[in-house]
Amino acid sequence: MKISSFISTSLPLPASVSGSSSVGEMSGRSVSQQKSDQYANNLAGRTESPQGSSLASRIIERLSSMAHSVIGFIQRMFSEGSHKPVVTPALTPAQMPSPTSFSDSIKQLAAETLPKYMQQLSSLDAETLQKNHDQFATGSGPLRGSITQCQGLMQFCGGELQAEASAILNTPVCGIPFSQWGTVGGAASAYVASGVDLTQAANEIKGLGQQMQQLLSLM
């Protein structure tokens, strides 16, 4: 079939695009090239971190951080099983608590809570120990709580308080140090699960009440 002519069809030019930076010719047709401003915006938005502060400032910041860590540890250790987050306000170097204030706070907390734990353990028997050991040895249970208070006194106080708290923690209960009766999954848990001599274990735990009374008298 003879084709006598060609019909030229002009292609419509694309609508103007905001941000186009150049228009060129390719094979007889107009083309537009869209330019992205993202790279320029990224460059414009970049900020440089300031240079490090002076050595003195960095030392102060580090000391403040250490103080927060110690306070946080104590608050978590003596939180009485609370699940609410503890918010510690910012401290200045002048506000950092002294070792004396730490020990005084720990003694005050022990004086307030140990009698409660002793009261809960005063009626302990074999059946209660076997049934409730996991509960007593976690959170704010009387075994965990009393052991935690003794650990705080041993770590942050000195003299007779430290010695008496250490003696209580190391007192054997059916051959297992009392400190291990405040945890789950260890030797004490295995002993309770065995069901052997639980009456003796309960009596020995109650017997520690006299030593804890002596501990309280030293505060």
UniProtKB/Swiss-Prot annotation:
Transmembrane segments: none annotated. Residues 101-219 form the Bacterial Rho-GAP domain. SUPFAM superfamilies: Bacterial GAP domain, Type III secretory system chaperone-like. One of its GO terms (biological process) is negative regulation of phagocytosis. One of its GO terms (cellular component) is cell outer membrane. Keywords: Cell outer membrane, GTPase activation, Membrane, Plasmid, Virulence. Residues 1-11 have a biased composition (Polar residues). InterPro entries: YopE-like, YopE_GAP_dom, YopE_GAP_dom_sf, YopE_N_dom. PROSITE patterns: BACT_RHOGAP (PS52059). Residues 16-32 have a biased composition (Low complexity). N-terminal is important for export, C-terminal is indispensable for virulence. Belongs to the YopE family. Essential virulence determinant; cytotoxic effector, involved in resistance to phagocytosis. This is Outer membrane virulence protein YopE. It comes from Yersinia enterocolitica.
